[in-house]
């Protein structure tokens, strides 16, 4: 994951707050996240932090979520641990996980703009949690519009209501899934599950390019080798 981020030209002044999600017990990835942030911010001399005294360590957070399924775990108990992982990912996306810091004042939304993942079962939980949030906000906006249209049908009151109504919360929750480098001709189980749901599905081998969950769905994108 971090080798991918090093190849990408990300502007830390645009992505002002970053959250790294690791599974429980994965201390190596947590340490790599801190190392990556330290190196990245050193290479960004133009980055300016808010005037309220926030520093580089407050512009990112490393959050640990339960594993969806541990090695050799029984399939009978796997659904329960998967639900625990899903709920933890849901809290992370809402900015309410106990290990998360308060986002910087410059952020416009409690939700992330982009979600980049290449993990196994945790990636499935994260992407599905993001899709659930987007569906919730979509349905909420539909019911809000219908409710107010039923209450008042006069044009004048509609204009007044549109002027008084608060601006909608800005959120993106765009998901990008990167298939494992080890998958050359077939998808992993996580890849098969996320193929219909991820906004962008990147593969690292040409044999997997242009695949679809079913006809009419978006195709997978060949991005070349993304790992060192």
Swiss-Prot record:
<feature type="transmembrane region" description="Helical">
    <location>
        <begin position="75"/>
        <end position="93"/>
    </location>
</feature>
<protein>
    <recommendedName>
        <fullName>UDP-N-acetylglucosamine transferase subunit alg14</fullName>
    </recommendedName>
</protein>
<comment type="subunit">
    <text>Heterodimer with alg13 to form a functional enzyme.</text>
</comment>
<feature type="topological domain" description="Lumenal">
    <location>
        <begin position="1"/>
        <end position="74"/>
    </location>
</feature>
<dbReference type="Pfam" id="PF08660">
    <property type="entry name" value="Alg14"/>
</dbReference>
<dbReference type="GO" id="GO:0031965">
    <property type="term" value="C:nuclear membrane"/>
</dbReference>
<keyword id="KW-0539">Nucleus</keyword>
<dbReference type="InterPro" id="IPR013969">
    <property type="entry name" value="Oligosacch_biosynth_Alg14"/>
</dbReference>
<keyword id="KW-0256">Endoplasmic reticulum</keyword>
<feature type="topological domain" description="Cytoplasmic">
    <location>
        <begin position="94"/>
        <end position="228"/>
    </location>
</feature>
<comment type="function">
    <text>Involved in protein N-glycosylation. Essential for the second step of the dolichol-linked oligosaccharide pathway. Anchors the catalytic subunit alg13 to the ER.</text>
</comment>
<dbReference type="GO" id="GO:0043541">
    <property type="term" value="C:UDP-N-acetylglucosamine transferase complex"/>
</dbReference>
<keyword id="KW-1133">Transmembrane helix</keyword>
<keyword id="KW-0812">Transmembrane</keyword>
<comment type="similarity">
    <text>Belongs to the ALG14 family.</text>
</comment>
<dbReference type="GO" id="GO:0006488">
    <property type="term" value="P:dolichol-linked oligosaccharide biosynthetic process"/>
</dbReference>
<keyword id="KW-0472">Membrane</keyword>
């Amino acid at each position: 994951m971090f080798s991918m981020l090093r190849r990408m030209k990300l502007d830390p002044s645009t992505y002002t707050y970053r959250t790294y999600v690791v599974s429980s017990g994965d201390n190596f990835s947590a340490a790599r996240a801190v190392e990556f942030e330290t190196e990245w911010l050193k290479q960004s001399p133009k980055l300016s932090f808010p005037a309220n005294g926030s520093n580089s360590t407050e512009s990112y957070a490393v959050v640990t979520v339960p594993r969806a399924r541990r090695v050799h775990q029984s399939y009978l108990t796997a659904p329960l641990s998967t639900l625990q992982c899903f709920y933890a990912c849901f809290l992370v996306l809402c900015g309410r996980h106990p290990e998360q810091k308060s986002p910087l004042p410059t952020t416009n939304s409690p939700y992330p703009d982009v979600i980049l993942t290449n993990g196994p079962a945790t990636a499935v939980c994260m992407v599905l949690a993001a899709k659930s949030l987007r569906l919730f906000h979509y349905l909420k906006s539909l019911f809000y519009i219908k409710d107010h249209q039923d209450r008042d049908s006069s044009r004048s009151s509609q204009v007044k209501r549109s002027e008084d109504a608060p601006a909608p919360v800005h959120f993106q929750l765009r998901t990008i899934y990167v298939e494992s480098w080890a998958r050359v001709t077939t998808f992993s189980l996580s890849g098969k599950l996320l193929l219909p749901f991820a906004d962008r599905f990147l593969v690292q081998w040409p044999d997997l390019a242009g695949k679809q969950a079913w006809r009419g769905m978006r195709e997978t994108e060949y991005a070349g080798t993304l790992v060192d």
